[in-house]
């Protein structure tokens, strides 16, 4: 059965060698522990989010390391280790603790899964290292659970809700029911989107929560159907979003209700196809085909992986490059000094435009409102989006005045 989505008037929501930043790295005298910087990639290698990060994240980080070595020729070694956190907070935090204690890891990144990231953030602060959350979405990471040792890099649930959520409500989608992944990310995405809906005159009629990597969405979708809400907001991601959409199609739910995918990635569109997703509006921090810079990186990535990079994978490359440049500029791998350099240096590369890291660790940068093309409009493989608007980081992300982070001076 063909699945009907929000059209242009009432659009469903999704959130979602390379050039370096224009600023030159000014090296200081080097004082690197063991004369080596070691980066850990903690990701989902085999689960529901593996297409978003996974092996592609490992590839992106290795590309960043290789490119940095070639361009800057640092006088210290750079190595990478990686592991599968299995979407379990205890597995992830234990692995990171082991890396810090026994393997000399200086920085950990990717970190898909907000529950894992919240646990890793605590260990990272305790061990005085650095973690850069690229794949996680919960705003808790820069609000009540912020630390001086962590950065939230690519996107968050506030930006997802704020950029495109308003468009849905203002174009008639004013009653909502949420289908929510039952962990930190899903809770955060539901809350932030609910706030946007209510602030713009809409109503939230209810919600239901499903476990991560749910095997059957029928009972949850039937509750959503019974609510008679105009919009069923999918506060989940990856395989859960894909399976939610497929199940809704099978049950015929979209005859009378519309689905809003609150975080989707280009790999989700690729899996579902343009026939299913045409007309959707999405918010993302990256699109492979945006300009010559993104295409140049993406071609190299595609040659290695046979798919185009997600926002997370491109963000991993950018985050690692930003970190390594800060190490050179600081002349040390000591976390506080490196973090100070990162926060004081603008970020402008193929991934982040007008980027900067705020005092709460939130990296703000331009976000993009895009629309999924019709099949007839797509001219080549992965030609999926039209960019409809560029939203500045200051407008897309939560204002510092609303931050609950104790590091923010008010």
Model features per residue range: what roles?
Residues 13-16:
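Repetitive helical segments and hydrophobic/amphipathic motifs
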Residues 2-10, 20-410:
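Extracytosolic ligand-binding ectodomains
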């Amino acid at each position: 059965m063909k699945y009907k989505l929000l059209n242009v008037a009432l659009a469903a929501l999704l959130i979602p060698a390379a050039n370096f930043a224009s600023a030159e790295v000014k090296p200081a005298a080097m004082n690197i522990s063991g004369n080596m910087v070691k980066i850990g990639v903690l990701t989902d290698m085999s689960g529901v989010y593996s297409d978003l990060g996974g092996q592609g994240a490992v590839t992106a980080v290795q590309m960043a390391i290789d490119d940095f070595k070639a361009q800057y020729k640092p006088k210290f070694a750079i190595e990478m280790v990686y592991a599968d956190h299995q979407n379990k907070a205890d597995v992830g935090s234990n692995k990171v603790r082991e890396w810090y204690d026994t393997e000399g890891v200086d920085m950990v990144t990717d970190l898909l899964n907000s529950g894992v990231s919240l646990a890793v953030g605590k260990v990272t602060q305790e061990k005085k290292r650095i973690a850069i959350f690229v794949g996680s979405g919960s705003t808790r990471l820069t609000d009540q659970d912020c630390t001086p040792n962590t950065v939230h890099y690519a996107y968050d649930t506030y930006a997802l809700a704020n950029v495109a959520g308003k468009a849905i409500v203002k174009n008639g989608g004013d009653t909502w029911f949420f289908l929510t992944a039952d962990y930190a990310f899903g809770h955060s995405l539901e809350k932030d989107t609910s706030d946007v809906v209510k602030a713009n005159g809409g109503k939230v009629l209810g919600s239901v929560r499903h476990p991560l990597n749910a095997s059957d969405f029928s009972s949850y979708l039937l509750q959503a159907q019974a609510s008679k809400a105009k919009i069923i907001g999918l506060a989940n991601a990856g395989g859960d979003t894909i399976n939610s959409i497929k199940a809704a199609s099978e049950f015929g739910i979209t005859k009378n209700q519309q689905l809003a995918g609150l975080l989707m990635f280009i790999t989700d569109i690729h899996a579902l196809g343009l026939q299913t997703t045409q007309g959707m509006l999405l918010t993302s921090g990256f699109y492979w085909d945006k300009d010559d810079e993104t295409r140049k990186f993406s071609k190299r990535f595609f040659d290695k992986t046979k798919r185009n990079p997600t926002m997370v994978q491109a963000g991993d490359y950018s985050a690692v490059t930003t970190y390594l440049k800060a190490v050179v500029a600081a002349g040390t791998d000591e976390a506080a000094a490196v973090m100070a350099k990162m926060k004081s240096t603008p970020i402008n590369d193929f991934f982040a435009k007008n980027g900067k890291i705020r005092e709460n660790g939130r990296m703000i940068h331009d976000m993009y409102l895009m629309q999924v093309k019709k099949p007839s409009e797509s001219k080549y493989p992965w030609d999926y989006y039209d960019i409809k608007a560029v939203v500045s980081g200051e407008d897309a992300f939560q204002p510092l005045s609303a931050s609950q982070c104790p590091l923010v001076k008010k």
